[in-house]
């Protein structure tokens, strides 16, 4: 079915390529004209194009001239002229597609033309890369082209403060990583003041390595979390004791491959008996399911001295690849606390989700999205279904010359690596450059020791120091170079045979103390000569390496994904260069062991000697089958993550939209009046639901009203007005109470002033929304954690999650309305009235008048207290999850709803009852 869908998706390829070629022809027709322009005239072209767009011309109509301007600017500033296929790739990006371009086709340069064209709208363009180093490098290098054309470029890096970030986003074109863009979006939606916002919208994004970012990393959502309120430690301790009474395969099941557990009926009964509850499936008990699952995982899936160690009474995570202790890292979603309870050490504060979004839903916010990669074909159907992105294969500038050899398979890892070292030694002796790909840091270091024993000089890259690695990878095509790298190391940097002239030139100018931003004019003046010298230096060596067969890529293991294998192969044979690739495998490799153990076992039992390589269709089929299983599992995980986040996303859009409008100064008076009517209507509906005026409990109704606002009308006055209890109707009661509430509100507004009241409305509603949304996220986390068990009760977990999530959202919105009204009536405030102040400014006029908004002070109306520590969880480059902990200075006590705050789980239980 997938292949059929892929064929259907590609039926329009010929038509699309024809359109792209027509664009390239139009751009080529303008080349001589733009070559004749002076630098100043090319710069003026930007102003002309921008004006034409403002006057109504579409960006598509401006594309040929804009692309021609960028091509000429790039030739003059970088000495790099766009090939026709690069212009075609750029046009594909502008049209909102994924441009599938092989490694070495210059994707970094491809992005400049569509980025420039779309920046003419003034709405900003985001170029998304896989790490900070590439973001900074590409921003600096391509920023020279943009600056030449009169545009600005910025770069978002992980440790920048908000002021710097705001400046970078204000640039015409901003580079950064997917994680940083996503976290800024979340932080903006936790902001208390408009001055804290850094992003300015989501207009157009170009995603480099789009398959890695939008596919591989999409299984892990972005999460900002902080210490949870309340004491949940008792439950962790309680459940660590409960699971000791449960037995695997009798009370619960464990799947080590998927790292999941499932509680069986017998186990559920034992837990219910132990806790003294009727039904673990009831909504009120949903939080308990998360504690139970984590306790079983801690018992069965997390092993002491393998996954973690205990040092000084603390649980410390061990990196599965390196064996190193990861100081400061903690497992998410209560897992760390469950392990602490299991080991009977101090249980530290649980983290609560403060804001979260999946990469899928973040990138779907952009008005237009595009991407580049060398390997998108295998995921074309998913790109279309999730992101509405078509994949357009762009022809190579020169025909591919690389030879991909068949795999060599050995019975075990030891003999496999012996054969790998022997192959490397032979090629190194001849001077052929070799790039060796491994699947983990541990394997890289193991191979490095074997190479050192043989006296083979080499570099080892483990995706830790991106700047150093990029410079080494760039020179990995030099004669005699041997580079061992994890599959992710040095991404985004081309390996050029004989060395990389561009990197050599940059290094030379850096030695001279020149910087492209600080010494812009000097740098531009020195660049052509430095680049020419570097090109000459690598030219002779390039010819030598060509004669040796080009770059040899050796894979020591098949990756879970065919795309990653293809990415590794694609390092060789760039721009029509010769090259060769081969994978060495063993039957004990993780992929074969976990996902095709039957085939591996049959081959292991064959009579072939251990040190003889196996080559058979059975091996090829086994590998393809194993990769298919993993890709299918990962695709299912992504689909599942998205299905559940889509439920939350609709709620998030509503809440974040409200917050943004409040921060931008919306007048909330009408909304507050709606809050008032809705809240009073709810109270009256509840009080008059049964019986008639004679039966209603007026004392209880007025007790409830007084918690909301200081009512001046009494129940007796309304009864007398109606002519007795029997003549009181719900509608009459409603009109009288609403009339009284509006009069009291009007009196409060007159007392503090209309302008002050509008500001108070904004501050209170923003504060209550912030607290209630965090509590809601907490409840939704626990709902999702336990929802899987509903399947045992013959109910669809997703449907249940949608239904209960909607009910919880409605309850939250009701609570926001009620609490906001309560604080607006009852909060004691101090007001400094608005005033116009005359300020001397030294101008000819001598002074000007500034309007100062009213200042409102009240207990709890300060900016909400920021957690002493925030934890950022995001996809890691290695395919796993990375966590960063950021300390924050504690602020003043928080929002006006603080006094009414209760532990979120208690509230969740109340609402569900």
Swiss-Prot record:
The top EC class is translocase
GO terms assigned for molecular function: ATP binding; protein-exporting ATPase activity
Q: Which SMART domains match?
A: SecA_DEAD, SecA_PP_bind
Annotated Gene Ontology cellular component terms: cell envelope Sec protein transport complex; cytosol; plasma membrane
- Could you tell me which InterPro entries the record lists for this protein? Helicase_ATP-bd (IPR014001), Helicase_C-like (IPR001650), P-loop_NTPase (IPR027417), SecA (IPR000185), SecA_CS (IPR020937), SecA_DEAD (IPR011115), SecA_motor_DEAD (IPR014018), SecA_preprotein_X-link_dom (IPR011130)
Q: How is this protein situated with respect to the membrane? A: Peripheral membrane protein
Compartments in which it is found:
Cell membrane; Cytoplasm
Q: What is the reaction catalyzed?
A: ATP + H2O + cellular proteinSide 1 = ADP + phosphate + cellular proteinSide 2
Keyword Protease recorded: no
Question: Where mainly located?
Answer: membrane
* Disordered as annotated region, ranges: 865-913
Q: Name one GO biological process term.
A: protein import
Q: What is its EC number?
A: 7.4.2.8
- Quote the record's binding site residues for ATP: 86, 104-108, 494
Q: Which family does it belong to?
A: Belongs to the SecA family.
This molecule's function is given as:
Part of the Sec protein translocase complex. Interacts with the SecYEG preprotein conducting channel. Has a central role in coupling the hydrolysis of ATP to the transfer of proteins into and across the cell membrane, serving as an ATP-driven molecular motor driving the stepwise translocation of polypeptide chains across the membrane.
Q: What is this protein called?
A: Protein translocase subunit SecA
Q: Which species? A: Paenarthrobacter aurescens (strain TC1)
What is this organism's lineage?
A: Bacteria, Bacillati, Actinomycetota, Actinomycetes, Micrococcales
């Amino acid at each position: 079915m997938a292949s059929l869908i892929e064929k259907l998706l590609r039926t329009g390829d010929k038509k699309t390529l024809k359109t792209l070629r027509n664009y390239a022809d139009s751009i080529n027709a303008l080349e001589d004209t733009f070559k004749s322009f002076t630098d100043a005239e090319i710069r003026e072209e930007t102003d002309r194009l921008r004006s034409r767009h403002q006057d109504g011309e579409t960006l598509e109509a401006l594309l040929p001239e804009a692309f021609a301007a960028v091509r000429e600017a790039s030739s003059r500033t970088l000495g790099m002229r766009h090939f026709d296929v690069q212009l075609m790739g750029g046009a594909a990006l502008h049209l909102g597609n994924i441009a599938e371009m092989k490694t070495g086709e210059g994707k970094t340069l491809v992005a400049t033309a569509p980025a420039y064209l779309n920046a003419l709208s003034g709405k900003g363009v985001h170029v998304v890369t896989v790490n900070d180093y590439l973001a900074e490098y590409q921003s600096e290098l391509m920023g020279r082209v943009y600056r030449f054309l009169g545009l600005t470029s910025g770069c978002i890096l992980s440790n920048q403060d908000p002021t710097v970030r705001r400046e970078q986003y204000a640039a015409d074109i901003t580079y950064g990583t997917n994680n940083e863009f996503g976290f800024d979006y979340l932080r903006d939606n936790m902001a208390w003041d408009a001055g804290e916002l850094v992003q300015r919208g989501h207009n157009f994004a170009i995603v480099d390595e789009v398959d890695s970012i939008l596919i591989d990393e999409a299984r892990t959502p972005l999460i900002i979390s902080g210490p949870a309120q309340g004491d949940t430690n008792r439950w962790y301790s309680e459940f660590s004791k409960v699971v000791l009474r449960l037995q695997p395969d009798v009370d619960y099941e464990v799947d080590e491959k998927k790292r999941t557990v499932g509680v069986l009926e017998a186990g559920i009964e034992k837990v219910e008996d132990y806790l003294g509850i009727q039904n673990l499936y009831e909504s009120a008990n949903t939080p308990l399911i998360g504690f139970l699952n984590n306790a079983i995982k801690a018992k069965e899936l997390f092993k002491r001295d393998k996954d973690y160690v205990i040092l000084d009474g603390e649980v410390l995570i061990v990196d599965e690849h390196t064996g190193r202790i990861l100081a400061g890292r903690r497992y998410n979603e209560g897992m760390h606390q469950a392990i602490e309870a299991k080991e009977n050490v101090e249980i530290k504060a649980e983290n609560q989700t403060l804001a979260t979004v999946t990469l899928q839903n973040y990138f779907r916010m952009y008005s237009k999205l595009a991407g580049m990669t060398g390997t998108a074909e295998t995921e074309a159907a998913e790109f279309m279904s999730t992101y509405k992105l078509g994949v357009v294969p762009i022809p190579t500038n020169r025909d591919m010359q690389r030879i991909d050899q068949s795999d060599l398979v050995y019975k075990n890892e030891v003999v496999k690596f012996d054969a790998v070292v022997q192959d490397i030694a032979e090629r190194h002796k001849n001077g052929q450059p070799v790039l060796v790909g491994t699947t983990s840091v541990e394997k890289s270091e193991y191979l490095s020791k074997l190479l050192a024993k043989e006296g083979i000089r080499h570099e080892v890259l483990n995706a830790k120091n991106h700047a150093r690695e990029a410079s080494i990878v760039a020179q990995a095509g030099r004669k005699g170079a041997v580079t061992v790298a994890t599959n992710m190391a040095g991404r985004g940097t081309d390996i050029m045979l004989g060395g990389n002239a561009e990197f050599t030139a940059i290094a030379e100018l850096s030695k001279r103390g020149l910087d492209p931003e600080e010494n812009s004019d000097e740098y531009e003046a020195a660049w052509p000569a430095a680049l020419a010298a570097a090109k000459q230096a690598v030219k002779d060596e390039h010819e030598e390496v060509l004669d040796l067969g080009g770059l040899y890529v050796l894979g020591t293991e098949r990756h879970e994904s065919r795309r990653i294998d293809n990415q590794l192969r694609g390092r060789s044979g760039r721009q029509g260069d010769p090259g060769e690739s081969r994978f060495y495998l063993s039957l004990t490799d993780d992929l074969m062991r976990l996902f095709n153990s039957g085939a591996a076992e049959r081959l292991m039992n064959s009579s072939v000697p251990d040190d003889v390589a196996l080559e058979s269709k059975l091996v090829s089929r086994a590998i393809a089958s194993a990769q298919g299983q993993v890709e299918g599992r990962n695709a299912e995980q992504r689909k599942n993550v998205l299905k559940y986040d889509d439920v939350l996303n609709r709620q998030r859009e509503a809440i974040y939209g409200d917050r943004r409008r409040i921060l931008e100064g919306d007048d909330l008076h009408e909304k507050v009046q709606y809050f008032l009517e809705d809240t009073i209507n709810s109270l009256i509906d509840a009080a008059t639901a049964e019986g008639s005026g004679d039966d209603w409990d007026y004392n209880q109704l007025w007790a409830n009203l007084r918690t909301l606002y200081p009512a001046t009308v009494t129940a007796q006055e309304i009864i007398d007005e109606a002519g007795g209890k029997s003549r009181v109707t719900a509608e009459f009661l409603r009109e009288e109470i609403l009339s009284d509430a509006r009069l009291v509100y009007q009196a409060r507004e007159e007392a503090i002033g209309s302008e002050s009241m509008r500001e108070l409305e904004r501050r209170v509603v923003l504060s209550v929304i912030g607290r209630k949304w965090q509590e809601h996220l907490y409840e939704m986390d626990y709902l999702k954690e336990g929802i899987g068990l509903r399947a045992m009760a013959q109910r669809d977990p997703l449907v249940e999650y949608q239904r209960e999530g909607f009910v919880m959202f409605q309850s939250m919105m009701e609570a926001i309305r009620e609490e906001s009204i309560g604080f607006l009536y009852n909060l004691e405030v101090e007001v400094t009235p608005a005033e116009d102040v005359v300020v001397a400014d030294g101008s000819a006029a001598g002074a000007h008048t500034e309007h100062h908004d009213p200042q409102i002070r009240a207990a709890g109306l300060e900016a909400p207290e920021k957690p002493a520590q925030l934890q950022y969880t995001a996809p890691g480059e290695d395919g796993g999850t990375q966590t960063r902990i950021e300390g924050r200075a504690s602020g003043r006590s928080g929002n006006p709803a603080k006094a009414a705050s209760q532990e979120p789980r208690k509230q969740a239980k109340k609402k569900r009852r």
